[in-house]
């Protein structure tokens, strides 16, 4: 991955600038570029607004390659693609429906530009190109500065890394990209990625849980939760976790904004009642 190029756009004093260099009168970029790791940090000399950034790496795709890119969230369809597949996107009818019903809770349609050409795919944080048992694995080491969007662009024979910087004004040193490229068999590349990120192997034992979803779906209230909690506590349920599922929030996605009409005492009070019964309290915040 030593060979790469960058493109950065930004505004200073309402003037738009576009460049592909590492130093201007407005910023300088320091970088680490190794075969398996690239990191780019920008130091602004003035506040940088409306920044967009991408880094492009050449890649020789082969006809029997398979491409996987991690989805935006758990509702995103994630699978391996053939190099000549069409990207998964909205058709014309679905795009028209977006004018009536926003799609923001269901995917990245509102903030990621889709390339509709065959062989053009995108995902978030990590992905790979697989040829039989050999994996070329690409992964971000940090998403604290914004989502890392990875694009596999087969027609142009390149892999592109972007940082989601919408709404960000860069005033201090900022990590534009921090990605690795590991090669090997599946377990090798994933184990090395987890090791690099210091992610320990989970050591959680088996647990049993109750969720409101399959009885009530979104039609839950504080009274319903309290009634079920009382009922469970009177039987030998062997339940470890009592989970409040979808329906407590005002709208899908607003998980920090409980519906006061349905949960007048608030979620903290409900969680305390769950704890008082000896259960761990769970709450649904999917699709993330």
What are the language-model segments listed below?
Residues 206-288:
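Aromatic-lined carbohydrate-binding/catalytic grooves of carbohydrate-active enzymes
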């Amino acid at each position: 991955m030593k060979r790469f190029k960058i493109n950065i756009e930004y505004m200073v004093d309402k003037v738009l600038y576009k460049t592909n260099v590492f130093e201007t009168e407005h910023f300088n970029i320091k970088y680490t570029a190794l075969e398996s790791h690239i990191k780019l940090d920008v130091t602004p000399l003035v506040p940088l607004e409306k920044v967009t950034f991408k880094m492009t790496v050449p890649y020789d795709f082969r006809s029997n390659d398979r491409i996987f890119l991690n989805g935006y969230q758990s509702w995103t369809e994630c699978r391996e693609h053939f190099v000549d597949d069409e990207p998964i996107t909205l058709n014309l009818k679905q795009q028209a429906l977006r004018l009536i019903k926003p799609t923001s809770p269901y995917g990245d349609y509102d903030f990621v530009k889709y390339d509709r050409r065959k062989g053009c795919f995108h995902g978030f944080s990590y992905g790979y190109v697989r040829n039989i048992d050999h994996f070329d694995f690409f992964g971000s080491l940090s998403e604290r500065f914004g989502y890392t969007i990875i694009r596999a662009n087969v027609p142009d024979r390149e892999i592109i890394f972007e940082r989601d910087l919408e709404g960000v004004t860069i005033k201090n040193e900022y990590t534009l990209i921090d990605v690795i490229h590991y090669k090997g068999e599946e377990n090798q590349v994933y184990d090395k990625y987890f090791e690099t990120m210091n992610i320990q192997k989970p050591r959680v034992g088996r647990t049993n849980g109750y969720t409101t979803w399959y009885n009530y779906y979104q039609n839950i209230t504080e009274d319903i939760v309290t009634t079920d909690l009382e009922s469970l506590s009177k039987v030998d349920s062997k339940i470890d976790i009592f989970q409040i599922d979808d329906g407590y929030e005002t709208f899908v996605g607003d998980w920090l904004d409980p519906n006061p009409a349905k949960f007048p005492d608030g979620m903290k009070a409900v969680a305390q009642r769950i704890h008082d019964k000896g259960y761990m309290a769970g709450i649904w915040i999917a699709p993330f």
